[in-house]
Amino acid sequence: MFSGIIDQLGRVQAVAEEGSARRLTLGMGYRDLALGESVAVNGVCLTVVSHDALGCADFFVSSETLVRSNLSALAVGAHVNLERSVSLATRLSGHLVQGHVDGKARLLSVEDEGQARRVTLSLPGELHPYCVEKGSIALNGVSLTLNAVDAGQADGRFAVAITLIPHTWSHTNLQHCAVGDEVNVEVDVLAKYVERLCHAYLTPSNA
């Protein structure tokens, strides 16, 4: 479990194909990683499979994760958002993030709003029920607040708007995203549980 507060930016050191999967080698500032530890990479929960004293670690990325996330597009030198898992003693400054990506959003625009930036993105239509104004969403693992959610577009997708404060912009890889790029999306897990419970108990057979 994570909180959506990015610890640091890492860099991709190597990408190796392993059948339909991949092994990512990331350079990071962590010096006390343990084998089997969970680290969120661009919001995707990955397991440390090896590491060294210089701060590099290897992660195995399954074919399912490659299809569902933007980790498939990573090349050597790319910046990635990193967050270590929370503990019971951790301050929950963001919101509960599982590291289970629901899909990818496409960046539509970035507009300056004083020192902040307003970012508009297009999301898959199936995620619309879980997105509400002033609700939480994780983009590339960053806990953010939805400022606006539209009713949907003709292509079956829908648009959302968020505001990035200067600190978030400068401390995450969202600063490196360009219009048309894809970012990982994880909607609020609480919204998914509520939707499932409502569907189970409010269908006509249970009404």
Question: Model-predicted segments: where are they?
Answer:
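Conserved loop->alpha-helix
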Residues: 1-207
